[in-house]
């Protein structure tokens, strides 16, 4: 009886952890994407709270993202200028307080793709519940598993287009 109860308990814990920490089924979903961007371009549509990685032939991979709060959104073009695993983070208002990479309290999550211009990045998160919202200071937040997928697909120099 104990063995059955323990198995049932473990199953419930596993399912609860999976539901809370997982991206929805649409994460990295291949979709039609009719726009004039070259394969390999990242397009962020802040109004949709979606990031598209253009794969070519009218197709893209679509990811849910968190974007800038009201007054913190931006639009324009950039390039990926750095790729970091377990990046450290410092608050823009207090750069002396650094949260080390890999810390559960680090809002950058497991990886970051920094953007030219020096202010913004596409990165993971320690708050998966924030994905799909207007939540950041201008950065593009992704589920950790999604940013790792994108991280493996792109290189320094990848073009990024952010639209409203």
Say what each PLM segment does.
Residues 1-12:
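Bacterial N-terminal signal peptides that target proteins for export
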Residues 5-7, 17, 48:
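Extracytoplasmic entry segments of secretory-pathway proteins
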Residues 15-24:
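C-terminal segment of classical bacterial N-terminal signal peptides
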Residues 27-125, 149-152:
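Gly/Pro-biased beta-strand-loop elements
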Residues 30-32, 138-144:
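Short, structured beta-strand/loop micro-motifs enriched in basic residues and often containing a Trp
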Residues 73-75, 137, 155-157:
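Short edge beta-strand segments in beta-sheet-rich domains
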Residues 89, 146-164:
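N-terminal targeting pre-sequences for secretion and organelle import
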Residues 129-138:
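Short, basic/aromatic beta-hairpin or loop at an interaction surface
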